[in-house]
């Protein structure tokens, strides 16, 4: 046994005190942040976040999602995060995962997948996290929402009917109705609405053999790409009588190309989505028709359903299949009603009844 000299005792005590003091300070540096994290975590847990994942804010139609979501977030007094994929599927999924991690899965989602194929990895991610969500527009036809407990619903508009309507209106503008040449612009080829709208166009063409589709390009829903593609196609086909496009952003790009070729107003254009510029183009005699899809309502309905499920006010598992994959009606727009539609939906915002999630239900998606 070692015996410390008496004179050494105070020095050893001081040493032990210094060690203990350092340990105590080290403990405090660990405990204080932990307490702060716990406190903020409990505070955060009391406030669910809302989140929307959309393609971009450079599209006037997509901006309506944001406007609607912001109005709903203000109404329910919850924070909102707006995520954009910028046409990058991996970015979309990564951002969704980051949002789940940031909120501790305390989030209700509305999602417009970048591509139909993206719906599955998104569903698996959010289902594993126990996070409720609603998707819009794109998913693979063979993927069923009810196979994922937290995937509340997939909602869309009738894309085939949209393609039929806009193509029919375009053909009416020909010098000889049902006789003429057209070019066309598709969106993203992997998107469900693009495929459906294209199918509608093909139906009309099959019923009107006197109309020839000379060329088409995929402009990826983008205005600039549509402008460039239209310019190129006009070089090869300067004698067309119409331009069919799968959305309004591409329609506006096509109109710009037609203006530069001195064909605007002579060659009509159709689109889909119902952005303000397209309404003005219809009024100005540059476009024949569009379809108004109410992006503000889309976002609010999706968030309201997700939040209700999270709060236990919507029992997802008890919903029939027809309420988990369904369509709601859009508004056909031409020169006859463009002023009224613009007044009702653009210059003003309707009061949406979100107490009945299926008030606008039109038909089930198989």
Which ranges hold each PLM region?
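Sec/Tat signal peptide C-region and signal peptidase I cleavage site
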Residues: 39-45
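Hydrophobic alpha-helical segments within soluble ligand-binding/sensing domains
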Residues: 92, 153-180, 226, 274-278, ...
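Hinge/cleft segment of the Venus flytrap/periplasmic-binding protein
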Residues: 185-189, 204, 301, 305-366
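Bacterial N-terminal signal peptides
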Residues: 26-39
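Flexible loop/hinge segments that line or gate small-molecule binding clefts
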Residues: 122-161, 181, 276-283, 287-288
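Hydrophobic alpha-helical
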Residues: 109-131, 201, 215, 219-281
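Short, solvent-exposed amphipathic alpha-helices that sit
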Residues: 61-76, 162-166, 192-211, 225, ...
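Extracytoplasmic "Venus flytrap"
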Residues: 49-68, 72, 76, 80-99, ...
